């Protein structure tokens, strides 16, 4: 039988396709060998398991930031006497010119801006206008605190709160340096009237030194409100919360409660409930 051109083309096509398939199969076998060889060489360069055990373990975070060891019992007593005996006579002489409660604040060249957020808070106190002209209340005039509400602000930076920035912030919140060498928030932003709450250094002995404020730093501060205390404790507590929040937001701090747990909205509401319960007990005792 004579083979035509068409049959020859079919045979040649089959041979070409078979050759292509064979070449592809050969290349695939050779590629697998090379890939395995490369993987083996790469794996051989890895260090032994015995020498790299730490690479397989979870990352370890070393806590180098320790919270200051100050609890509620270490806070200055609101009924404690003024500690003037420990100061040198020259330092007391400097403070005598500016008064006991506000020494050297005029010499700090700080532009204190009484912002609207805090001036509006003053409207919570019915006797605010009278308090501006009233004499400043001494913390010694207050009865001993039966209960203390504490809000601590802990600095997230390892260097802590710097003195000048800290002073500027709390002055804007209406706190004034005063008795017991700590800061107090009075009924008036000017520093007159009754004491609403106070702020102490979280590092023992809990005091501040305005003469060395430029070199001062602290890892944390504590705001505290004593009961019995201000005539309107719930409003005073709200002002204290606002001051603590302002400090934490502007100076990179973290709010903590008296148990050194993160201050939450539930904790703040629990504090308010403690105030309500204290006022209820006080009314019951008067009857």
Curated annotation (Swiss-Prot):
Keywords: Cell cycle, Cell division, Cell inner membrane, Cell membrane, Membrane, Transmembrane, Transmembrane helix. Residues 70-143 are annotated as: Disordered. SUPFAM superfamilies: Cell-division protein ZipA, C-terminal domain. It is found in: Cell inner membrane. Residues 1 are periplasmic. The keyword Membrane applies. GO terms for biological process: division septum assembly; FtsZ-dependent cytokinesis. Signal peptide: none annotated. Residues 23-287 are cytoplasmic. It is a single-pass type I membrane protein. The keyword Membrane applies. The chain crosses the membrane at residues 2-22. One of its GO terms (cellular component) is plasma membrane. Belongs to the ZipA family. Essential cell division protein that stabilizes the FtsZ protofilaments by cross-linking them and that serves as a cytoplasmic membrane anchor for the Z ring. Also required for the recruitment to the septal ring of downstream cell division proteins. Interacts with FtsZ via their C-terminal domains. This is Cell division protein ZipA. It comes from Pseudomonas fluorescens (strain SBW25). The gene is zipA.
């Amino acid at each position: 039988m004579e083979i035509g051109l068409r049959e020859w083309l079919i045979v040649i096509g089959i041979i070409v396709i078979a050759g292509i398939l064979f070449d592809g199969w050969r290349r695939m076998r050779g590629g697998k060998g090379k890939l395995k060889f490369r993987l083996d060489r790469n794996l051989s360069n890895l260090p032994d398991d015995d020498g790299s055990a730490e690479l397989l373990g979870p990352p370890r975070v070393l806590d180098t930031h320790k919270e200051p060891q100050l609890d509620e019992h270490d806070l200055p007593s609101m009924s404690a006497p003024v500690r003037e005996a420990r100061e040198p006579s020259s330092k007391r002489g400097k403070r005598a010119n500016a008064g006991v409660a506000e020494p050297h604040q005029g010499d700090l060249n700080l532009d204190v801006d009484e912002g609207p957020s805090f001036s509006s808070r003053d409207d919570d106190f019915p006797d605010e206008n009278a308090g501006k002209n009233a004499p400043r209340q001494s913390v010694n005039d207050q009865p001993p605190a039966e209960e203390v509400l504490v809000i601590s602000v802990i600095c997230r930076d390892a260097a802590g709160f710097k003195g000048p920035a800290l002073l500027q912030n709390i002055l804007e919140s209406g706190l004034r340096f005063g008795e017991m060498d700590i800061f107090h928030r009075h009924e008036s932003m000017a520093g007159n009237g009754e004491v609403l709450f106070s702020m102490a250094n979280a590092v023992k002995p809990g005091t501040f030194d305005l003469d060395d404020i430029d070199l001062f730093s602290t890892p944390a501060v504590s705001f505290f409100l004593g009961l019995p205390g201000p005539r309107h404790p719930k409003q005073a507590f709200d002002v204290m919360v606002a001051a603590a929040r302002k400090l934490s937001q502007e100076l990179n701090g973290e709010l903590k409660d008296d148990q050194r747990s993160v201050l939450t909205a539930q904790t703040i509401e629990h504090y308010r409930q403690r105030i309500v319960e204290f006022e209820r007990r006080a009314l019951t005792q008067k009857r």
